[in-house]
């Protein structure tokens, strides 16, 4: 029988049908090759938006800089970055007037954070520009390299472990005449292999000392490395994102902490909360506008889009905002917070890897590094690239481009949200002094504007006033891409509002399925995703039950662990059948060992091992979870692990799941080919840290481990702990006198070695 699909929707409210419009099947696009072109686009565009500003030259590094602040007022609708200082300050003052004490209190809270934050805060984060090696590294390695170089250049405040003291070193490093760094390099030589008698290339990794003069060091400290943003859907062109070095990161962290504290107190801010909390907060603003637009008023909502938000923001504007926000605070605090915007107004964008050329006829490939773009003959390039290079040339120094205006993606999300909210705040009747008024929501560059007025002319006037006010602070609302509708239907940060936020379950579809970490984690993540979607995304019981069955099926196919009594033949079926036959309580077998599935929608919160524990054979239990079984991995597993799940749209989300260490929680070994590359030095450093941390954990089991508050080093802490433990063990008779004496002797030797060093 044919079913008319429209019948399916007869009983469904229109807004619930949004999941059927899901556009994102298949893999998102990834970028290949170099990001140099995209970065040049960003730099050139940013300068174009501010082209009527004043040019100056940075006296320290000789970089040309463009300052659009207080530039000409816009005469057309083209995007521009000419923010007016007095307008920004006025918006800040009004924000403070409507929220008495907001800046004062946020400053006090931030001051407390600044005093307490430890340097290891900077190890969070993924790729970071490592200025010592002039390329990207994991954050922890980049921080360690920076501290190592600082210490070898007599900058030692950081030894206290406080982030604030590390930043003192950063400030001091900028005044030094030169900095000595250690770089890794690669030597290649051809040698004859004894076994095969063939010639092979042998690579050795060396470390060499290099001196950077003040100018070179400053350029590196102010450099943002650029990469291409991957996995962006719905765009034809890729775009560049930036990753700053360790000198900038600490200062940015404190500014963002302050801005975060302010955002938490603003009802129009979509940051820093997320998920259901965010929906509730936003729904309040909408409710307020709808109840206030009594029968006499019209209410319209704009689903807003800003043109090139980051490229029209300006660090100098942020400096003005911070100066105002912290105006009654102690001098040291104001100085620390003003450093991030100052460094950003002197930033340099690293152009990345450069261009790859290949000659089809001669089968040759050659890399033109970014450093050569300043001098190379342009006849080799196509027209569009030629134009880009010509435009960027005056800005180049050592393969980096001077980029004073603009913010680069994702650096000051919180602070720019404060700026956006301050304009929304000006929509109150007491400021507009007319019949229209507005309010709205702001989350970084995304906004929704709700305008109320007695008639359509009033709505139009309100929108125009908002548009012009934004222009004065460097925010460019796009008239082409923004959409106005009666209040009650709009979209904000991928949340769709129709008389309440609609659960767009299809957005979560890509996160269903088998993650591919290991059998244990995958089972746990799979059921947690289903559970979370029942809680947050209107996933109904019948659909959830179906999702669960599909997941189990998918899981069995992925790990070839079909039930022991199945007819399906796979590589593992022989072993699993044998296990099935010799197991008395077959329900006790995990799904990954060919057991049946006991999950249903009521028990998704229980890890599978716990669910089946009472049903397991004793000897199976003993193999599965025995800490003495070499295949049971206990090192890496905490009781709660976190996985990264990818929704279809928006950032990857971190999701927590319960983890139980069993023979199935294996960790894949690292690819060995890294050992032959110049990354090897990095790997050795990483292993050294791992060993130190493991040793430290032996001395301080997690129950007694508190963050060190004093300024003792790890070694001192371990030595004093060893002495205390030894004394207790000796006095309680757990160790003999000779052993006690030997421990004390070792401790003294270690201290002696430290003194000599």
UniProtKB/Swiss-Prot annotation:
Cite a single Pfam family from the UniProt record.
Flu_PB1
GO terms (BP aspect): DNA-templated transcription; symbiont-mediated suppression of host gene expression; symbiont-mediated suppression of host mRNA transcription via inhibition of RNA polymerase II activity; viral RNA genome replication; viral transcription
Tell me where the signal peptide lies: none
Q: Where is this region: Disordered?
A: 55-82
- Please provide the record's keywords in A-Z order: Eukaryotic host gene expression shutoff by virus, Eukaryotic host transcription shutoff by virus, Host cytoplasm, Host gene expression shutoff by virus, Host nucleus, Host-virus interaction, Inhibition of host RNA polymerase II by virus, Nucleotide-binding, Nucleotidyltransferase, Phosphoprotein, RNA-directed RNA polymerase, Transferase, Viral RNA replication, Viral transcription
Q: Where is this motif: Nuclear localization signal?
A: 187-195, 203-216
Give the residues annotated as coiled coil: none
Record keyword Phosphoprotein present:
yes
What's this protein's function? RNA-dependent RNA polymerase which is responsible for replication and transcription of virus RNA segments. The transcription of viral mRNAs occurs by a unique mechanism called cap-snatching. 5' methylated caps of cellular mRNAs are cleaved after 10-13 nucleotides by PA. In turn, these short capped RNAs are used as primers by PB1 for transcription of viral mRNAs. During virus replication, PB1 initiates RNA synthesis and copy vRNA into complementary RNA (cRNA) which in turn serves as a template for the production of more vRNAs.
- According to its UniProt record, which protein family does this protein belong to? Belongs to the influenza viruses polymerase PB1 family.
From the Swiss-Prot or TrEMBL record, give the protein name.
RNA-directed RNA polymerase catalytic subunit
Its source organism is Influenza A virus (strain A/Equine/London/1416/1973 H7N7)
């Amino acid at each position: 029988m044919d079913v008319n699909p429209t019948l399916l929707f007869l009983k469904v409210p229109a807004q619930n049908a949004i999941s059927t419009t899901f556009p994102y099947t298949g893999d998102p696009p990834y970028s290949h090759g170099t990001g140099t072109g995209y970065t040049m686009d960003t730099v050139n565009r940013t300068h174009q938006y501010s082209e009527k500003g004043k040019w100056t030259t940075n006296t320290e590094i000789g970089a040309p800089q463009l300052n659009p602040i207080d530039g000409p007022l816009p005469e057309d609708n083209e995007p521009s970055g000419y923010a007016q200082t007095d307008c920004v300050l006025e918006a800040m003052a009004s924000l403070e007037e409507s929220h008495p004490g907001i800046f004062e209190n946020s400053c006090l809270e931030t001051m407390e954070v600044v005093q307490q934050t430890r340097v290891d805060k900077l190890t969070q984060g993924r790729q970071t520009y490592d200025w010592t090696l002039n390329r990207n590294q994991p954050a922890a390695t980049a921080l360690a390299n920076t501290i190592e170089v600082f210490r070898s250049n007599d900058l030692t405040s950081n030894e206290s472990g406080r982030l604030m003291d590390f930043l003192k070193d950063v400030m001091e490093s900028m005044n030094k005449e030169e900095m000595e760094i250690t770089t890794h390099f690669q030597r290649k030589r051809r040698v004859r292999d004894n076994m095969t008698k063939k010639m092979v290339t042998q690579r050795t990794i060396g470390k060499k000392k290099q001196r950077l003069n003040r100018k070179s060091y400053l350029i590196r400290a102010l450099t943002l490395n650029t990469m291409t943003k991957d996995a962006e859907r719905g765009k034809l062109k890729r775009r560049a994102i930036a990753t700053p070095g360790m000198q900038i990161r600490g200062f940015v962290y404190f500014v963002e902490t302050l801005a975060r504290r302010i955002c938490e107190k603003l009802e129009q801010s979509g940051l820093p909360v997320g998920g259901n909390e965010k929906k509730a907060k936003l729904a309040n603003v909408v409710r307020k506008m709808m109840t206030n637009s009594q029968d006499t008023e019209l209410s319209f909502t704009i689903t807003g889009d800003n043109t090139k938000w980051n490229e029209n923001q300006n660090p100098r504007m942020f400096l003005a905002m911070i100066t105002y926000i912290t105006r009654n605070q102690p001098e040291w605090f104001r100085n620390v917070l003003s450093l991030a915007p100052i460094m950003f107004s002197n930033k340099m964008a690293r152009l990345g890897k450069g261009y790859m050329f290949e000659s089809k006829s001669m089968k040759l490939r050659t890399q033109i590094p970014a450093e050569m773009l300043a001098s190379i003959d342009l006849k080799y390039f196509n027209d569009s690239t030629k134009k880009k290079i010509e435009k960027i040339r005056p800005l180049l120094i050592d393969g980096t481009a001077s980029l004073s205006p603009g913010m680069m993606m994702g650096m000051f999300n919180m602070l720019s949200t404060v700026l956006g909210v301050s304009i929304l705040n000006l929509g109150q009747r007491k400021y507009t002094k007319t019949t229209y008024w507005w309010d709205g929501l702001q989350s970084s560059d995304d906004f929704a504007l709700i305008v109320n007025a007695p008639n359509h002319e009033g709505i139009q006037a309100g929108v125009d006033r908002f548009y012009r006010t934004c222009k004065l602070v460097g925010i460019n609302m796009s008239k082409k891409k923004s959409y106005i509708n009666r209040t009650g239907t709009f979209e904000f940060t991928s949340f769709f509002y129709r008389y309440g936020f609609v659960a767009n379950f299809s957005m979560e579809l890509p996160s269903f399925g088998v993650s591919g970490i290991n059998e244990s984690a995958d089972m746990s993540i799979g059921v947690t995703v289903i559970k979370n979607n029942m809680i947050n995304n209107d996933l109904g019981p019948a659909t959830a039950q179906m999702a669960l069955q599909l997941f189990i099926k998918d899981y069995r196919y992925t790990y070839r662990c079909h039930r022991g009594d199945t007819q399906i033949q796979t590589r593992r079926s022989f072993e699993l059948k044998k296990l099935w036959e010799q197991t008395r309580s077959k329900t006790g077998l995990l799904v990954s060992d060919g057991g049946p599935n006991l999950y249903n929608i009521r028990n998704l919160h229980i890890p599978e091992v716990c669910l089946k524990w009472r049903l397991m054979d004793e000897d199976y239990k003993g193999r599965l979870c025995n800490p003495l079984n070499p295949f049971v991995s206990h090192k890496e597993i905490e009781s709660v692990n976190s996985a990264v799940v990818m929704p279809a749209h928006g950032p990857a989300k971190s999701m927590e799941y319960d983890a139980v260490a069993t023979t199935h929680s294996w960790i894949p070994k690292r690819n060995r080919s890294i050992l032959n590359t110049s990354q090897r030095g990095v790997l050795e450093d990483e292993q050294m840290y791992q060993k130190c941390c493991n040793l430290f954990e032996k001395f301080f089991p997690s129950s007694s481990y508190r963050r060190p508050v004093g300024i003792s080093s790890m070694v001192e802490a371990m030595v004093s702990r060893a002495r205390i433990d030894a004394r207790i063990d000796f006095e309680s008779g757990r160790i003999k006198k000779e052993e006690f004496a030997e421990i004390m002797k070792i401790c003294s030797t270690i201290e002696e070695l430290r003194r000599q060093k």
